[in-house]
Amino acid sequence: MDEKEREILEETKNQEELESQDFDLEDILKEFSDEPPAAEAEEPEESFEEEQEEEDAQPAVTGDTIRLDKLDTARLETVPMDETRRIEIEEVTPVDKEAEYDQQASFVNSRPIVFLPRSRLRELKRKLIAGPEKRYYDLSEQGVGRLQIAIVLSILVVLLSAGATALYELGMVPENRMKLMVFGQFFAMLVSALLGVYQLLDGLVDLTRKRFTLNTLLVVTLIVCCIDGVFCLDALRIPCCAAFSLQVTMSLLGEYHKRTIEMGQMDTMRKATRLHSLARTPDYYEGRPGILRGEGEVEDFMDNYEKLSGPEKLTCVYAVLALLASVGLGVAGGVLHDTQTGFQVAAVTLLAAAPASFFVTNSRPLAILEKRLHRISTVLCGWKGVKALSGRVAFPLAHRDLFPAGAVKMNGVKFYGTRDPDIVVEYATSLITMGGGGLVSLFESLLASRNGLKYPVENFRHYALGGIGGEIDGEPVLVGTMSFLKDMGVEIPEGIRVNQAVYVAVDGELCGLFALTYEKQAGVASGMSTLCAYRSIKSVMTDSDFMLTESFIRSKFGVNTRRMAFPEETVRQELRDKELTEHSVVGALTTKQNLESMAYAVTGARCLRTACRLGTGMHVFAGVVGIVMMAVLTVLGRMDLLTPANMFLYELVWLIPGWLITEWTRSV
């Protein structure tokens, strides 16, 4: 007999012994209890009998209840380990409720819209780190120190070249030093080109992008001037080094502006915890497009800030035409005179076609504006955003824009008549809450401090005179300014001269006066001033606040309210209900939702557009004038007037108005 058969026989005997035994509940509990056995205390027979009666009196056991003392012995049988149970799992396909409800045409999305500020902030930070912050650190590694040193050295080259040119024109250079003078000027021109080598490389890179910019034209100018300089060494003629060095200096200055602008914009974006957008929406008020506010996206800025502006595109077209004109005049000079004269004419024509200030006409106005926008945490979304914020627009204003939280305070309360003061407060709060506006929270706090209640208002209406009215418990109630109550026939006691106060009248009798203090903040005042300074901007009051009348705003902020609009209540309600559409164009992003940031974005954009367009137009005109002058002198053969001194003076003459135009954005 094997060992396995012996083990099977022993297990069978043990199983039969277990089946033959009867187990009580107490035995089972004792078997599985961890507590040590305690000494059994003698109990009287009466208590045992009472427990026996209570046990017999237990309620009937329901079908879903199992009594341990009634366990069937068959349940205690052990299941062989080698027995395998098969369990079939049926896969349940989820029901597409939305599709089912759509077929029945009775689906209603009952799931609530959950606002997850943390997830939005996390997504915003992820985009900011991948875009603006990464770009900011790349620019920080490049820095602006080398550019500043190059600009200073280039200015020194300009001064030395201009001084040497002046000595030559005054006849203070001896003939035996002429070759040294010419070689020195030619060497200075090469040094200037070395200082602006990155600008020249940018001009070549622009060709690969299918752009012919001023830097590309500067590369051609360098090549032609170098060839002309070789002829100058043979003819002992001074090359136009001063004019070329001045152009290189201004090109370096333009690159410095572009880098500081981008660093400032990226710094503003990377510090954002929330972005607010200013977008242009068509047909907002009286046919004017409106500048509405909404949630901003990082892509609104990153996708547009590097795109060429309208003036820059015009500059590229002009640069190509200027090159063709210069080549044509050079060929004409070579045909009419000789090869040396042809290169001389081409060189001076290229210099005259692009005045030095042309290189900063688009960058410097934005650099000046960016310093102010950076302080108020605002960025413009490229030239597309500048165009969106320009033109004749309507700018909506609300109570929170003029008086942010905490700017309006209760200065005092005075009651008149025999009516209960708590009733007066309750009536006033009920009416103001129905009307809405910036005074709701203030009066609700006053009502809560008095443990008051709100009453239902009937026949509520707004009055154009500066107040609201309605019926509460069958009594007519008026709330508004002092002039409003006087116009409504309410008698005001003599001696009351509080203008900034809310007056309450019940049944034609003055019952209360709530004096208010409106704090004028510097940022709000500057924002209102810049908005009202432009005729093309119409500031529209959209809030239902009877205190914000035209006379009150004029006296409080000292602005020209004739450029503001105070529409009827029905129109204000329609304006408040308007939202951004798919046709809205984002013009600017700001991290602070205050009036100063939004107002300067709008007015700054239109100043920038004016400065860039005016500057580009003026420099194109100056270049055309220079090309025409070179053509006339070439035809007349007056090569004696094409001197380096005259070319440098020509650059300086157009530098003054061009520089002044770039200051336009300081007037914002």
Give, region by region, the residue ranges found by the protein language model.
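Asp-based phosphoryl-transfer active-site loop
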Residues: G385-V413
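Hydrophobic alpha-helical transmembrane segments
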Residues: A188-Q199, D228-F231, F244-T273, R280-A394, ...
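Cytosolic-side membrane-insertion boundary helix
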Residues: L124-L153, L308-G310, Y600-F621
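Conserved ATP-binding TGD loop and adjacent catalytic N/P-domain core of P-type ATPases
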Residues: E286-P289, I472-E475, V506-A645
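ATP-binding catalytic core of ATPases
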Residues: G417-L465
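Signature of the cytosolic headpiece of P-type E1-E2 ATPases
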Residues: Q148, M181, F231, S449-F552
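Intrinsically disordered, low-complexity acidic segments enriched in Asp/Glu and Pro
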Residues: M1-S106
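Core alpha-helical transmembrane segments of integral membrane proteins
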Residues: G145-D202, A631-M647
